């Protein structure tokens, strides 16, 4: 019932997602921020101070979502931007990878900007992972053949399955299906510069784990498109 109330509130948005996107992009332009591309957008509800216990007023991603006063909430769109190279955006969130010998955890998260737009205008702005581009290490690098990337992914899925400790007598068959694959950019530790990061092309895979057709969870893997190394989460 409460979820339906939130959906009805969000259905009252008076502008299109594209119109909101143009407003968010105008904010970036006005601030002189370039080199960012849209990676995600979603409907949400913004609450003013005192209308929701969550500090940022978004009412997202926690139990505080259900404590907001919808009579005071404003529906809108939340836009997430990240570093973009020739139209290809970066991974906005850290992704957990199995700890293997060729796993490289970036020293800090990918730079992202989140902007919430309502009918009253901008209600939320957050800039995470602010960074400075020092130099370009190399250009026009050759990517690893996709067949080798697939082999790396298969290894990672096997490591995950092996970690479950399923006994030899257990006949339960776990299924792993790749439901999404996308080429993006992300950070990896810079060679001999542990406090710096390289922005590198990477394959982002979403793998669905299921039993007998019943989905259990979705797993995310990030594999460096240049050398096949596994990239872990920035903590």
Language model regions located:
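C-terminal structured domain segments
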Residues: 189-195, 202-214
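Preferential activation on post-signal-peptide N-terminal prodomains/segments
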Residues: 1-105, 131
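Generic short beta-strand segments
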Residues: 81-89, 184-186, 206-210
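Conserved histidines in hydrophobic membrane contexts and catalytic metal-binding motifs
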Residues: 24, 115, 203-205, 228
